[in-house]
Amino acid sequence: MILIRHLINTRDLSQEEVIGLLDEAEGYLDTKHRNHLKGRLVITIFFENSTRTLSSFEIAVKRLGGEVVRLDVSRSSTTKGETIFDTAANLNAMSPSAIVVRHKNAGVPNLLAKHTSCSIVNGGDGAHAHPTQALLDLLTLKRSLGRVEGKKIAIVGDIRNSRVANSNIELLGRFGMEVILIAPPHFMPKTNLRQHDRLQEVIGEVDAIMSLRTQTERHEHPIYASLKDYASDFCITKELLGDRKIALLHPGPVHRNVDIDDEMLKDPRCKVLEQVTNGVAVRMAVLRYLIEGSAPTLKIEESA
């Protein structure tokens, strides 16, 4: 019986698998094309908007020599009442090697994994999980800090509604980082992690900051009269960081001068674009591992 691998959340990967994937991803940073997925088909189906995740998955497939088909949800039969399960069953009948799915409802990728015979990759489900984002964030931190064990990171912003925060809290904590949550009470989840409502309280002790977007689309009612009100307390500025050696991350899209100010986005300590670059490489490693089924390896074969 062939084992079908899925990536629904970060806990699907062992410590050794994560290390192997990140090592492999670093080899892909040369942007060279390979033939690992030659003759393989990957379908992307995103029920929520995406720029970085969707594009990087599709680029990852092509750099591995595979074929990718994007299902345009706005023109698909889901608009005619077809259930997502019927959609998945029909896509599965076309024999893809993997389906990458994003959905507003938590749990959808896990359900699809039980109704298809190909690998399912979670490209983000509601406020639940975004495993490949956490993997690329870990790679970015390792490349920026040298090592992450024993280091401290402050996650700042709309944590309660953030799938990125959920996945990073699990993965970074597993690799020995102390995760500190910074948010107003209405953005703070129930947790045993250390919490503060002002970044200034911990700025002198953290090695990295992860700023998060305020996810207004997941709020039932407006929380702030204006995002400027939020920014006055939580925007990451050069004045706040001073000359501290702190790596600054953000999963995107960035609300300029709300999450991070213009000057800080141009600062070399800001790793936002490095995250995007690392994202393609990480997704290459994930897709190769799930589809080929062999363990992540440091040795990357060059295309012929």
Curated annotation (Swiss-Prot):
| Cross-referenced SUPFAM superfamilies | Aspartate/ornithine carbamoyltransferase (SSF53671)
Q: Does the keyword Transferase apply?
A: yes
A cellular component term, taken from the record's GO annotations: cytosol
Say yes or no: keyword Transmembrane helix present: no
Tell me which UniProt keywords the record has, alphabetically: Pyrimidine biosynthesis, Transferase
Catalytic activity field: carbamoyl phosphate + L-aspartate = N-carbamoyl-L-aspartate + phosphate + H(+)
Q: In which pathway does it act?
A: Pyrimidine metabolism; UMP biosynthesis via de novo pathway; (S)-dihydroorotate from bicarbonate: step 2/3
Signal peptide bounds: none
Q: Which residues bind carbamoyl phosphate?
A: R52, T53, R102, H130, Q133, G252, P253
From the UniProt record, give one GO term of the biological process aspect. Answer: 'de novo' UMP biosynthetic process
| Enzyme Commission number(s) | 2.1.3.2
Enzyme kind, highest EC tier: transferase
The residues that the entry says bind L-aspartate are: K80, R163, R213
* MF terms in GO: amino acid binding; aspartate carbamoyltransferase activity
NCBIfam families attached to this UniProt entry: asp_carb_tr, PRK00856.1
Similarity comment text for this entry: Belongs to the aspartate/ornithine carbamoyltransferase superfamily. ATCase family.
| Function in brief | Catalyzes the condensation of carbamoyl phosphate and aspartate to form carbamoyl aspartate and inorganic phosphate, the committed step in the de novo pyrimidine nucleotide biosynthesis pathway.
**Subunit details:** Heterododecamer (2C3:3R2) of six catalytic PyrB chains organized as two trimers (C3), and six regulatory PyrI chains organized as three dimers (R2).
Please give the name of this protein.
Aspartate carbamoyltransferase catalytic subunit
Which species does this protein come from? Wolinella succinogenes (strain ATCC 29543 / DSM 1740 / CCUG 13145 / JCM 31913 / LMG 7466 / NCTC 11488 / FDC 602W) (Vibrio succinogenes)
High-level lineage:
Bacteria, Pseudomonadati, Campylobacterota, Epsilonproteobacteria, Campylobacterales
Q: Which gene encodes it?
A: pyrB
